[in-house]
């Protein structure tokens, strides 16, 4: 009597082991989950039985299994779309398609559509093809052959040197079975229904695997004594003794064969349960593999071809072939489904990624600021690019978060903002120009709101209360209705009614008339071009406007409050609320008028629905960068978005069982201007809003800039650089370090370690650099290191990177804000002026006092402060260099950004739309016949 190779108990053992494996991983990583999708089309009862069996087994093993049942008439196209979605979903680890499919759907096309890394059936050409190679490493092996090999091993049946005959040549069983036996050193003969003298061939076999799908195809007299018989077949034959009228049998004549064979598998109860068990094993293997890959997250560095002298920025950028952005995304753990591609080298990242990675602890958060800016340029953006490249060279995942530059300066005098030398963001032409159109969306939203303001005043001035109310509440069918956005205004007015017919005449008047006071309108139109002649204009001159003219102006698009909202929004809902509460004017009673009062808040959000998603790009060395938002640094926060930072921090973050300090990656972002402006706003506005806590500060300084702050002669665009800036002068550098020391002091007030990066130029001497280092350390910096990233890329900034790693991993910090928002407005301004600028105090003009009273009366007194002042001095006076003292900051006016969520006092006249110089940068910009842009810098 043959040994019964029973598989039911073995399959149960496999499921128990899988459950234990999953539980073991969950004990250290509670967020680990194993997910299987079973796709079925139609409702065949035999398919339903198999699906229920697989689902039950999956649940027993601790696997999350979803049965996705599509209707019988689903199109092949729609089925392929569904599979594509599961392929791209990083939370799905295995996909199986329950066969057969309806006749109108091509099974080959559908099964091949399953991604190889999720093909847990092991059916696809990639996995089968790799299996056939001698050294092939398929991601998955077909479940039935894998289960048979497991049965043979469990029962101690040695196949090495034996002659195995496999009957059946399907891609599911026969072919992969023959390969597995051959790889186990058996000699294999593959037969099929057309094989001649098949009985004679089978009689030579030590092992027979029958998988031909014909009941009792293999007769007992075909088998030699002591053969091992593996029966894969499961066939239904009539049996009057059974309640169902049929019974299941295999491809081998079991009752007679068991008298000849030494071992045989029963049907059912052996190969079937093990097939399902191996399917589950494949799913768990896939989940473990995905988990391992999700923790790897290390981009491959692109090599640099350094040249001396260093070529132009655009030459360097064009000499590097960027990675395909999808490949870079995959390297850092962004799923394809979480991307919206804009060509090959940039893609928007969907905000849903934050939900998937919500369990991760944040990576290290670093802000780059600088000393007080000079016409030389200190190179914060270049340092940001070089630093993330350097961190990547040290095997740390590093992501840059930077602002999208405005086209105004690009075509004006400043040029682009993609970094420089061998520390750039690429493709630099796309970075500096339209990118993904976010700034154009800001322009459209801002101008729509401006149009809504003037249009509303026009219609209120030309219609009666009744006519205005009637037109605002148009009839749908035979019923008058409020538009959904109107309920926000009704709530603001305290009118708790939903039917327009129920409002009293007074309520109708209050609802319909905004009564905007034209002199209080603070909302300008925008464009992304420097144009001084649009600073002050008159609108409404056409006769069709019936004499309703007013003076207004244009701002640069990045100066719009919409851009500030984009930078400070924490999600789509938050952006909608912020846009709706933007104050554009006051009414004639002194009450604020908002975008939602105008009914345009929702439309603004629609225009910005894509702009809210950060754009993934890369540095020259192929490290990731998230480019998003670009608000002014004087009248706004001067930093990239909260959402970009949050996404980057999760991508660079750690799982619960990883070392949160040693294994975390780095997010390096930049604050505009210096510590007194950009950094102060970054902490007190951006971090206050986001709740994120930075780990370290990098202050960028240069020898030339410190000489200017030490009393060196003034410099300006187009003028020769005085000789003192080209020769060694250690004393002048030390005097200028008073400015650096003040910025270090400012930074230390937030409880964070400070690393000074000395941006190196060829004219700098070792003595000058040593002097800066000494002064920086004396002022409280954790470290001060020179950096040559402009000429050498990431390797040139390794010293700064190592100092930063030490500061984040080994130096204690306790982040704190500078002031409590519940302090009076004047007190908050005074704290900033004294602590950040070194002032003795502040002085409010009568207009500023009037604004202060208005904002307090309107309920905006608990907002943070965003002082607009010159960037060229720690004080309000651009001519005061170094670290001035004994001065009072005059506050000439105050403005409100209610949507963005801050008040910005004006300590200087700030131009919100620059002009163009005599020779703008556009003189140098052109395009070659092959489409290459030339002259962009």
Swiss-Prot record:
**GO BP, sorted A to Z:** 10-formyltetrahydrofolate biosynthetic process; folic acid biosynthetic process; L-histidine biosynthetic process; methionine biosynthetic process; one-carbon metabolic process; purine nucleotide biosynthetic process; tetrahydrofolate interconversion
Q: Which CDD domains match?
A: FTHFS, NAD_bind_m-THF_DH_Cyclohyd
- Residues recorded as binding ATP, renumbered to this chain, are 374-381
Q: Which SUPFAM superfamilies match?
A: Aminoacid dehydrogenase-like, N-terminal domain (SSF53223), NAD(P)-binding Rossmann-fold domains (SSF51735), P-loop containing nucleoside triphosphate hydrolases (SSF52540)
Example GO CC term: the record gives: cytosol
Q: Which keywords fit this entry according to its UniProt record?
A: Amino-acid biosynthesis, ATP-binding, Cytoplasm, Histidine biosynthesis, Hydrolase, Ligase, Methionine biosynthesis, Multifunctional enzyme, NADP, Nucleotide-binding, One-carbon metabolism, Oxidoreductase, Purine biosynthesis
- The record lists NADP(+) as bound by 168-170, 193
| Catalytic activities | (6R)-5,10-methylene-5,6,7,8-tetrahydrofolate + NADP(+) = (6R)-5,10-methenyltetrahydrofolate + NADPH; (6R)-5,10-methenyltetrahydrofolate + H2O = (6R)-10-formyltetrahydrofolate + H(+); (6S)-5,6,7,8-tetrahydrofolate + formate + ATP = (6R)-10-formyltetrahydrofolate + ADP + phosphate
For this chain, one GO molecular function annotation is: methenyltetrahydrofolate cyclohydrolase activity
EC number(s) from the headed UniProt entry: 1.5.1.5, 3.5.4.9, 6.3.4.3
Q: Which InterPro entries match?
A: Aminoacid_DH-like_N_sf, Formate_THF_ligase, Formate_THF_ligase_CS, NAD(P)-bd_dom_sf, P-loop_NTPase, THF_DH/CycHdrlase, THF_DH/CycHdrlase_cat_dom, THF_DH/CycHdrlase_NAD-bd_dom
Compartment annotation: Cytoplasm
State whether keyword Hydrolase applies. Answer: yes
Q: Where is this region: Formyltetrahydrofolate synthetase?
A: 310-937
Where are the residues of the annotated region Methylenetetrahydrofolate dehydrogenase and cyclohydrolase? 1-309
Description of how the protein assembles with itself and partners: Homodimer.
Family (UniProt): In the N-terminal section; belongs to the tetrahydrofolate dehydrogenase/cyclohydrolase family. In the C-terminal section; belongs to the formate--tetrahydrofolate ligase family.
Any domain commentary?
This trifunctional enzyme consists of two major domains: an N-terminal part containing the methylene-THF dehydrogenase and cyclohydrolase activities and a larger C-terminal part containing formyl-THF synthetase activity.
UniProt protein name? C-1-tetrahydrofolate synthase, cytoplasmic
């Amino acid at each position: 009597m043959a040994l019964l190779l029973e598989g039911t108990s073995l399959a149960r053992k496999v499921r128990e082991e899988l459950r234990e494996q999953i539980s073991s991983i969950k004990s250290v990583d509670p967020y680990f989950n194993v997910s299987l999708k079973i796709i079925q089309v139609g409702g065949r009862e035999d398919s339903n039985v198999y699906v229920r069996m697989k689902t039950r087994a999956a649940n027993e093993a601790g696997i999350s299994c979803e049965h996705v049942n599509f209707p019988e008439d689903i199109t092949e196209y729609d089925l392929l779309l569904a599979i594509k979605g599961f392929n791209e979903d990083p939370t799905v680890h295995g996909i199986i398609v329950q066969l057969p499919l309806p006749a109108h759907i091509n099974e080959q096309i559908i099964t091949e559509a399953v991604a190889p890394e999720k093909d847990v059936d092991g059916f696809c050409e990639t996995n089968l093809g790799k299996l056939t190679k001698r050294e092939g490493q398929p991601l998955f092996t077909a479940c039935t052959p894998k289960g048979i090999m497991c049965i043979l091993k469990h029962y101690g049946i040695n196949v090495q040197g034996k002659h195995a005959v496999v009957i059946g040549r399907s891609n599911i069983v026969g072919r992969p079975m023959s390969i597995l036996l051959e790889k186990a050193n058996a000699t294999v003969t593959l037969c099929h229904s057309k094989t001649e003298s098949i009985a004679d061939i089978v009689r030579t076999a030590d092992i027979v695997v029958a998988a031909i799908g014909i009941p009792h195809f293999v007769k007992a007299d075909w088998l030699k004594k002591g053969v091992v018989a593996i029966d894969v077949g499961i066939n239904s034959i009539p049996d009057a003794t059974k309640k169902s009228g049929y019974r299941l049998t295999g491809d081998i004549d079991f009752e007679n064969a068991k008298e000849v064979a030494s071992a045989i598998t029963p049907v059912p109860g052996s190969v079937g349960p093990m097939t399902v068990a191996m399917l589950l094993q494949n799913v768990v293997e896939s989940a473990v593999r995905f988990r391992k890959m999700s923790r790897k997250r290390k981009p491959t560095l692109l090599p640099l071809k350094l040249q001396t002298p260093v070529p132009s920025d655009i030459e360097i950028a064009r000499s590097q072939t960027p990675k395909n952005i999808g490949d870079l995304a995959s390297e850092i753990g962004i799923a394809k489904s979480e991307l919206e591609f804009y060509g090959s080298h940039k893609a928007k990242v969907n905000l849903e990624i934050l939900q998937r990675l919500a369990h991760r602890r944040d990576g290290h958060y670093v802000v780059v600021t600088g000393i007080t800016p000079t016409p030389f340029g200190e190179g914060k953006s270049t340092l940001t690019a070089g630093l993330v490249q350097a961190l990547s060279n040290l095997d740390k995942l590093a992501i840059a978060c930077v602002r999208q530059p405005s086209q105004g300066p690009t075509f004006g005098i400043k040029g682009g903002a993609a970094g420089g030398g061998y520390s750039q963001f690429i493709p630099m032409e796309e970075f500096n120009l339209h990118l993904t159109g976010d700034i154009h969306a800001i322009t459209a939203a801002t101008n729509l709101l401006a149009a809504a303001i003037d249009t509303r005043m026009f219609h209120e001035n030309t219609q009666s209360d009744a006519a205005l109310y009637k037109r605002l509440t148009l009839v749908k069918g035979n019923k008058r209705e409020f538009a959904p956005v109107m309920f926000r205004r009704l709530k603001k007015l305290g009118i708790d009614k939903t039917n327009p017919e129920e409002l009293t005449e007074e309520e109708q008047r209050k609802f319909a008339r905004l009564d905007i006071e034209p002199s209080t309108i603070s909302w300008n139109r925008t464009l992304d071009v420097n144009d001084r002649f649009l600073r002050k204009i008159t609108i409404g001159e056409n006769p069709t406007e019936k004499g309703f003219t007013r003076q207004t102006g244009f701002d640069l698009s990045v100066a719009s409050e919409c851009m500030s909202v984009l930078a400070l929004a924490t999600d789509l809902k938050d952006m909608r609320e912020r846009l709706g509460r933007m104050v554009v004017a006051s009414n004639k009673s002194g009450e604020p008028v908002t975008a939602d009062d105008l009914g345009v808040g929702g439309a603004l959000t629609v225009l910005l629905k894509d702009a809210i998603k950060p754009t993934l790009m890369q540095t020259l060395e192929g490290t990731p960068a998230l480019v998003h938002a670009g608000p002014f640094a004087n009248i706004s926060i001067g930093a990239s978005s909260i959402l970009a930072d949050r996404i980057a921090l999760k991508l660079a973050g750690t799982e619960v069982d990883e070392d949160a300090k040693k294994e975390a990656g780095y997010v390096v972002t930049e604050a505009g201007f210096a510590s007194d402006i950009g950094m102060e706003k970054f902490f007190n506005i951006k971090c206050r809003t986001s709740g994120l806590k930075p780990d370290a500060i990098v202050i960028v300084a240069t020898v030339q800039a410190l000489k200017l702050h030490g009393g060196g002669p003034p410099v300006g665009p187009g003028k020769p650089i005085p000789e003192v800036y080209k020769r060694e002068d250690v004393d002048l550098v030390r005097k200028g370090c008073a400015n650096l020391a003040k910025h270090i002091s400012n930074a230390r007030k937030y409880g964070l370690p400070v690393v000074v990066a000395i941006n190196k130029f060829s004219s700098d001497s070792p003595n000058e650099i040593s002097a800066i280092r000494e002064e920086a350390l004396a002022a409280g910096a954790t470290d001060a290191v020179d950096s040559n990233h402009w000429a050498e890329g990431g390797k040139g900034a390794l010293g700064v990177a190592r100092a930063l790693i030490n500061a984040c991993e080994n130096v204690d910090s306790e982040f704190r804000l500078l002031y409590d928002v519940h302090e009076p407005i004047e007190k908050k301004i005074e704290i900033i002026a004294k602590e950040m600028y070194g002032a003795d105090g502040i002085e409010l003009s009568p207009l500023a006092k009037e604004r202060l009273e208005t904002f307090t009366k309107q309920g905006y007194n608990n907002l943070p402060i965003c002082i607009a002042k010159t960037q060229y001095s720690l004080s309000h006076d651009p001519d005061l260099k170094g670290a001035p003292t004994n001065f009072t900051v005059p506050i000439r006016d105050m403005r409100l950004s209610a949507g963005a969520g801050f008040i910005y006092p004006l300590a200087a006249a700030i131009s919100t739309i620059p002009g163009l110089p005599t020779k703008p940068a556009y003189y140098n910009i052109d395009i070659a016949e092959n489409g290459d842009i030339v002259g962009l810098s």
